[in-house]
Amino acid sequence: MHQAASHMKKRTIALIAILAALLTACTGKTDYNTTLVQADSLMASRPDSALHMLQGISTKNLSTKADRAYHALLLTQARDKNYIRQTDDSLIQVAVRYYDTHEDAPLQARAYYYWGSLYRDQNDYSGAIDKYAIALSHINDHPGNAELKTSLYSNLGYLYYTQGLNSEADSIYQRAELLAKSQKDTTSLCYTLSQRGMISLTQGKNYYPKAEQQMQQALSIGKAFSDSMVLVPIYHSLSMLYNLMPKPGQALQYARLNYSGLKDTLHCYRTFLLLGNAYFLNGQYDSADIFLQKILKAERYYDTKADACMRLSE
């Protein structure tokens, strides 16, 4: 009887030890997952806090490939959101390889998006376009993921536009416009309409009325929500358009609105050019000269300085 009780006690102790070990292992893994998920939840509102949390996690303590991939993705994302320029893609490739193998479409798309952003920051725009396009292909037909789709449309559209691929840019912006309307995302809608207006502007005089309609629609929506961050670039685009049409009074009106909405009015050299051109167009040559001369003090902005010099020579 005593031996049986002793044997039972040993078995119970052994079982408790095994359960404790399993619980410790599970708790350790869960803790790290919880930390990663918490960092992810902070990414939009407090990216600096998310970065601090992620930097405090040692990869040696991440016991699974899933955790290491998630950490690699989040750390790359946090650096991007904190405007830290990244030149080494070895970290994000950890995430890309894992999610490609496990075919997790939303996380695949996210990994390729931040891989593309790394190329973008290195001014490798063709590489960025390639990665962004792959990212979009993973979630194009999936419901949801609106925020990531919006970011992809915005970046792809802008890169196509800067590369002179206006047809591709406008196609992407059309999709962005539909998404923004469906999500009632007025900020993205204003940006998209304004960018489509800029594309129309570059297509020549016959497209100026279309450009005006798109930009004024963006302005109307933006004014309804009184967001200066949205309105300022629209004012800039409209002033450029009216300078070309030409409609001198409106060109000057929107150039002034653009200038008054800026936080930095000491180094806004492109706005100085906008104002200089608008004042010149209105025959106010002294005012034009004041703003154009400001541009010549810039250390960079060589194209803007060249345009200012051409206008001053007139």
Predicted regions span which residues?
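Bacterial N-terminal signal peptides
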Residues: 14-22
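Bacterial N-terminal signal peptides that target proteins for export
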Residues: 2-14
